[in-house]
């Protein structure tokens, strides 16, 4: 086992805070409409140019072990916020840095770190409640476009494309992002369905960079029981292999010998296959299998209708133009089912929605309607170069996540103003002791920081603007893009409530952990000095007598 360096108290915390500052200072240059780009070197190919906070954070590894620990903890803030809300990574990083920086001043002055953390947690809980009060639903296409535009670094065209896509496939519909083949962004809507089941083995993956299995023009076998014996499958596999097309198997489960054989055939290239579990449970699973059958023009192989796997022919299988199978989701694009049959199925489910008594049943039935009727929207991102394409695609992904978050939990005024307004509701908050009060004041100071950073990146005086915004009310704030004060919601400067809440919660969580850390253990640097080698032989002077 390698030797370890153990560092205690302020010595450990100071180094870790240095790491926090290095990462946060790199990330926060990207915040706001006038934030700057960051250029990232790659070990191969050209550099990446990005204004996406989480992309910058992910690239940072520091040489000093303790500094790197601090940086990695804040990187976790950015990643977690991106996972939950899809955006707000830079805001989360800025908040975390501020809480750590202010908190360290109190810790060094002798305040109890655990009480500071309790005070921080109290303030954050109260701030989240205030944000929920400020929030309003995001319903119009215009608002969705505004959220998308801001998340895509004020790119109006991206926001507009996402709003159009949501309008066409519905808010529950599936939207995917692909590389375009022209300079312009394109939107295409194709009939399709997504369900929450992924591949049963990672060996089915044929696009490692995306971690998905993509099948072009596949057959779809639908079976309502488990498949364990490969002999049952052989007749249909032989027919599909002769056709030269791939096969997706959707069954209650595929296991043992059957799964192993499918994987081996897939790896050897004998027949391209993928297997997934059927979505849903019990009666709902049967209904969803039937939905997929109607969408793909196939039949669910079931004993009730006198069909077994051995008797299955190609006529019983569904077909689709394309299938994408990920770790947790499967998307069926352009199924070969009859349009009238799909329409009749949708009408049938809508009748069931009307008759359903429980909210849960209604919700699940509405999900099925959305899956059958909504389709899949594909946004093709256009750009002049590959570097620009990657950067733009990352922004479209961010914008897509942000708009979904906005539809889910509503919107609040952007530009850091919502946090300033939420401060008003927690100014009277008191802790159980003076140390907890200090924790509350740390959060109050941190909640100003996103606005300060946005203003600083725009080249203005942060102190003056913060005072002006605090003196105003409601949605009024500072628009860094225009340099003017006004109603930010009316001007389209809005943020998803979910994003700001996630940023604040994650920042406080990790910053609190860092403040309560009193010992850091890292691997000791290896001794690079030369090895023992042979002793000095004193030169060759004693060998003269051999001549």
Curated annotation (Swiss-Prot):
Organism: Polynucleobacter necessarius subsp. necessarius (strain STIR1)
EC numbers for this chain: 5.6.1.7
Record keywords: ATP-binding, Chaperone, Cytoplasm, Isomerase, Nucleotide-binding
Xref: Pfam families: Cpn60_TCP1
GO cellular component: cytoplasm
InterPro entries in the cross-refs: Chaperonin_Cpn60_CS (IPR018370), Cpn60/GroEL (IPR001844), Cpn60/GroEL/TCP-1 (IPR002423), GroEL-like_apical_dom_sf (IPR027409), GROEL-like_equatorial_sf (IPR027413), TCP-1-like_intermed_sf (IPR027410)
Group of enzyme by EC: isomerase
Reactions mediated catalytically: ATP + H2O + a folded polypeptide = ADP + phosphate + an unfolded polypeptide
Protein name, entry field: Chaperonin GroEL
Stated role: Together with its co-chaperonin GroES, plays an essential role in assisting protein folding. The GroEL-GroES system forms a nano-cage that allows encapsulation of the non-native substrate proteins and provides a physical environment optimized to promote and accelerate protein folding.
GO molecular function annotations of the record: ATP binding; ATP-dependent protein folding chaperone; isomerase activity; unfolded protein binding
Sequence positions that bind ATP: 30-33, 51, 87-91, 415, 479-481, 495
């Amino acid at each position: 086992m390698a030797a370890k360096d153990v560092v205690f108290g302020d010595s450990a915390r100071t180094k870790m805070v240095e790491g926090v500052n290095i990462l946060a200072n790199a990330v926060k240059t990207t915040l706001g409409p006038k934030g700057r780009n960051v250029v990232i070197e790659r070990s191969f190919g050209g550099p990446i140019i990005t204004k996406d906070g989480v992309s910058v954070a992910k690239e940072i590894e520091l040489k000093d072990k303790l500094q790197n620990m601090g940086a990695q903890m804040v990187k976790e803030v950015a990643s977690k916020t991106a996972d939950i809300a899809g955006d707000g990574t830079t805001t989360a990083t800025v908040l975390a840095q501020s809480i750590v920086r202010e908190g360290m001043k109190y810790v060094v002055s002798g305040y109890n770190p655990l009480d500071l953390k309790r005070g921080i947690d109290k303030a954050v809980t109260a701030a989240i409640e205030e944000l929920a009060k400020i929030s309003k639903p995001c319903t119009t296409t215009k608002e969705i476009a505004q959220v998308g535009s801001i998340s895509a670094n004020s790119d109006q065209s991206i926001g507009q494309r996402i709003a159009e896509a949501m309008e066409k496939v519905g808010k529950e519909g599936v939207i995917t992002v692909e590389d375009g083949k022209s300079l312009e962004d394109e939107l295409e809507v194709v009939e399709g369905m997504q369900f929450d089941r992924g591949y049963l083995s990672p060996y089915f993956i044929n696009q490692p960079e995306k971690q998905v299995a993509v099948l072009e023009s596949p057959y779809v076998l639908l079976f309502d029981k488990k498949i364990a014996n490969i002999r049952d499958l052989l007749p249909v596999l032989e027919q599909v292999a002769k056709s030269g097309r791939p096969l997706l198997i959707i069954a209650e489960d595929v296991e043992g010998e059957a799964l192993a054989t499918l994987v081996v055939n897939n790896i050897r290239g004998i027949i391209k296959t993928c297997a997934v579990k059927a979505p849903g449970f019990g009666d709902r699973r049967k209904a969803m299998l039937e939905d997929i059958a109607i969408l793909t023009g196939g039949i669910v192989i079931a004993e009730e209708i006198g069909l077994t796997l051995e008797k299955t022919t190609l006529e019983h299988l569904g077909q689709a133009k394309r299938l994408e199978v990920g770790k947790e989701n499967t998307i069926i694009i352009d199924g070969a089912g009859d349009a009238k049959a799909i329409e009749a199925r949708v009408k049938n489910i809508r009748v069931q929605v009307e008759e359903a008594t429980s909210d849960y049943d209604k919700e699940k039935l509405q999900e099925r309607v959305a899956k059958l009727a909504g389709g899949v929207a594909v946004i093709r991102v256009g750009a002049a170069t590959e570097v620009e394409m990657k950067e733009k695609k990352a922004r479209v992904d961010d914008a897509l996540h942000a708009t979904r978050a906005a539809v889910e939990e509503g919107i609040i005024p952007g530009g850091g103003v919502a946090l300033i307004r939420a401060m008003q509701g927690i100014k009277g908050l008191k802790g159980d002791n003076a140390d907890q009060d200090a924790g509350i004041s740390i959060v109050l100071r941190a909640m100003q920081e996103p606005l300060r950073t946005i203003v600083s990146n725009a080249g203005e005086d942060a102190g003056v603007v913060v005072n002006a915004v605090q003196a105003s009310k409601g949605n009024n704030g500072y628009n860094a893009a225009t340099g003017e004060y006004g109603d930010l919601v009316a001007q389209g400067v809005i943020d998803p409530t979910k994003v700001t809440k996630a940023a604040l919660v994650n920042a406080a969580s990790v910053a609190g952990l860092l403040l309560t850390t009193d010992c850091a253990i890292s691997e000791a640097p290896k001794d690079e000095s030369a090895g023992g080698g042979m002793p000095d032989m004193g030169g060759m002077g004693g060998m003269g007598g051999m001549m």
